[in-house]
Amino acid sequence: MNTVVDTPELMVFTDSAAMKVKELIEEEGNPELKLRVFVSGGGCSGFQYGFTFDEEVNEDDTAFEKNGVTLLVDPMSYQYLVGAEIDYSEGLEGSQFVIRNPNATSTCGCGSSFSA
């Protein structure tokens, strides 16, 4: 059973991130795409974040919806992302999706690796 969560304190999917995902999905021409955010082992701090587009919603995924866009998180990743903010930023260092995670005890300078 899929869980659709509308509770901002569990995870924040910012307007900026949702709008960028919507733009990317429109460029792909496939309205069935959803953004999957995941945590995997690796990176210089033990865990790393990943992003991919997915048409499939797994039975145990948690789905967050914002501005017509769906963000998917698998159960293993969800435990590391509770309370996190998924954002999109554009700056001098380039454009990127950013995760601000209160569960991370340390992060790497690369911004995509953390320890918990």
UniProtKB/Swiss-Prot annotation:
Iron-sulfur as UniProt keyword: yes
Signal peptide feature range: none
UniProt GO molecular function: 2 iron, 2 sulfur cluster binding; 4 iron, 4 sulfur cluster binding; iron ion binding
InterPro entries (alphabetical): FeS_biogenesis, FeS_cluster_insertion, FeS_cluster_insertion_CS, FeS_cluster_insertion_RrpA, HesB-like_dom_sf
Residues involved in iron-sulfur cluster binding: C44, C108, C110
GO biological process: iron-sulfur cluster assembly
Pfam families given in the database record: Fe-S_biosyn
UniProt keyword terms in alphabetical order: Iron, Iron-sulfur, Metal-binding
Cofactor(s) named in the record: iron-sulfur cluster
Cofactor note: Binds 1 iron-sulfur cluster per subunit.
Domain of life: Bacteria
Entry similarity comment: Belongs to the HesB/IscA family.
Function: Required for insertion of 4Fe-4S clusters.
Known partners and oligomeric status: Homodimer.
Name of the featured protein: Putative iron-sulfur cluster insertion protein ErpA
Species of the source: Aromatoleum aromaticum (strain DSM 19018 / LMG 30748 / EbN1) (Azoarcus sp. (strain EbN1))
